[in-house]
A protein has these predicted regions:
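Core catalytic lobe of class I
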Residues: 1-288, 298
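PRPP-dependent phosphoribosyltransferase catalytic core
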Residues: 291-304
Length: 304
């Protein structure tokens, strides 16, 4: 007797207005062809371009503005990771208006766009400011990046809850008079140049399976780092650039931080087996960054 297999083949899923619970042979073409996407930058199917950087330029921090990065060839950087100065009269900031501040960032990020390879990524850590009124910096940056032609890949919420005091509240105490929200998060905005993907070629990935599954979630939870420990008014923890470097670069790639401050992104790139290039206008912070990198390099040589 011939037995017939009556199991039905699963149909592929499609993106709808209310999402899709699974991803089986998923077809999202009709969704991305909808009018919702008409005015947004589109992925360009262009030839991959990558130009080499002089060896003497690699693994160096320049004490100058990143508004003009003539030391770098166009199409040479694989990843930008940065946290722009917050412009709240911290000692290294100028007192810029909001429009002047946005203009500065746009100038730097336009220059960064030129320096990124096809499919290169730009990751921007930003905190919103103020309460009277609240300034949604991350929204302004997204608007400006899209206007420049960057493709937005998503945003990560950095939950700093463990760094917040559980016994502190702002505004009217136990009253609807004027309760004030306390930000316990920052944003990490993720963009690409021209293409969402990069070809690996002979390069190696270095991210572990468990980390990939965890870090591709849109909420990351780890504490902030003390300014007193680092010696810089607004440092981010090494965990932040480490995750981005592991997710978005291959071993040996080049990481740029155009506002490198104390050099955390540069130091982390070195630890992760990548090259780095940094820029900062404050000589004291360039000195601090180089000192941190030197101490790590000396320690690594000693261990060998």
């Amino acid at each position: 007797m011939i037995q017939t297999n009556h199991r039905k083949r699963k149909n592929g899923t499609k993106t709808s207005s209310f999402g899709s619970p699974g991803r089986i042979g998923h077809d999202s073409s009709s969704f991305y062809a909808s009018r919702l996407y008409e005015e947004l930058p589109k992925e360009n199917h262009v030839k991959y371009i990558e130009n080499p950087i002089l060896v003497e330029t690699l693994d160096k921090i320049f004490c100058k503005s990143s508004e003009h990065m003539e030391e770098l060839p166009d199409n040479s950087i694989h990843l930008m990771v940065t946290s722009p100065p917050y412009n709240v009269k911290k000692e290294y900031d100028e007192d810029l208006s909001l429009n002047e501040y946005r203009t500065l960032l746009k100038t730097v990020f336009k220059e960064t766009y030129k320096k990124l390879v096809t499919g290169g990524r730009a990751c921007i850590n930003v905190a919103n400011l103020g309460r009277k009124p609240y300034i949604p910096l991350h929204s302004y940056i997204i608007e400006d990046m899209l206007e420049m032609g960057f493709l937005m890949r998503g945003e990560i919420i950095w939950n700093k809850a463990s760094s917040a005091s559980p016994s502190t509240a702002w505004g009217s105490w136990l009253s609807a008079g004027n309760p004030v929200l306390r930000d316990i998060h920052e944003y990490i905005l993720i963009f690409s140049k021209e293409s969402f993907s990069r070809k690996r070629g002979s390069k190696k990935d270095t991210i572990a399976k468990e980390d990939f599954l965890e870090w591709t979630k849109s909420v990351w939870t780890f504490p902030a780092v003390s300014a007193r420990i680092i010696g810089h008014p607004a440092p981010f923890p090494e965990e932040l650039p480490h995750r981005l470097i592991q997710l978005y670069t291959f071993k040996g790639d080049i990481v740029l931080d155009p506002f490198c401050g104390s050099g955390t992104a540069c130091l982390t790139a070195l630890k992760d087996g990548r090259h780095y290039i940094g820029y900062d206008i404050e000589s004291a912070y360039v000195k601090l960054a180089n000192q941190r990198i030197k101490e790590y390099s000396n320690h690594r040589r000693y261990q060998k």
